[in-house]
Amino acid sequence: MTSATQFDNVSVVKRANVYFDGKCVSHTVLFPEGTRKTLGVILPCALNFGTDAPELMEVQAGKCRVKLDGSSEWQTYGAGESFSVPGKSRFDIEVLETLDYVCSYL
């Protein structure tokens, strides 16, 4: 069962995903139906990420600004908000306050 605060009956990959010299660290969570998510933290910084699959980024805590590939507009997101990123694209993220996030691969 999944609630607003936790994921139940899942497997977690023990080894962390560490990117950008430790500025972004996440763990992969595997669900019984075959889907996966990552739970992570990004420290205050400016980064550029690439995606393979479409992603839904849910902000649990913190604050960031995001600019999707091909857009000139920055959007600001905080706790309780989310944004979608198309597959096979890139996005810029400027983390203003340490970001706690859940990333769903769609």
Curated annotation (Swiss-Prot):
UniProt KW Glycosyltransferase keyword: yes
Keyword vocabulary terms for this entry: Glycosyltransferase, Transferase
InterPro entries, per the entry: Ppnp, RmlC-like_jellyroll, RmlC_Cupin_sf
EC number: 2.4.2.1, 2.4.2.2
Catalytic activity: a purine D-ribonucleoside + phosphate = a purine nucleobase + alpha-D-ribose 1-phosphate; adenosine + phosphate = alpha-D-ribose 1-phosphate + adenine; cytidine + phosphate = cytosine + alpha-D-ribose 1-phosphate; guanosine + phosphate = alpha-D-ribose 1-phosphate + guanine
Entry annotated with the keyword Glycosyltransferase: yes
GO molecular function, a single term: uridine phosphorylase activity
EC supergroup of this enzyme: transferase
GO cellular component, one term: cytosol
Annotated Pfam families: Ppnp
Superkingdom to which the source organism belongs: Bacteria
Job description of the protein: Catalyzes the phosphorolysis of diverse nucleosides, yielding D-ribose 1-phosphate and the respective free bases. Can use uridine, adenosine, guanosine, cytidine, thymidine, inosine and xanthosine as substrates. Also catalyzes the reverse reactions.
UniProt similarity note: Belongs to the nucleoside phosphorylase PpnP family.
Record-given protein name: Pyrimidine/purine nucleoside phosphorylase
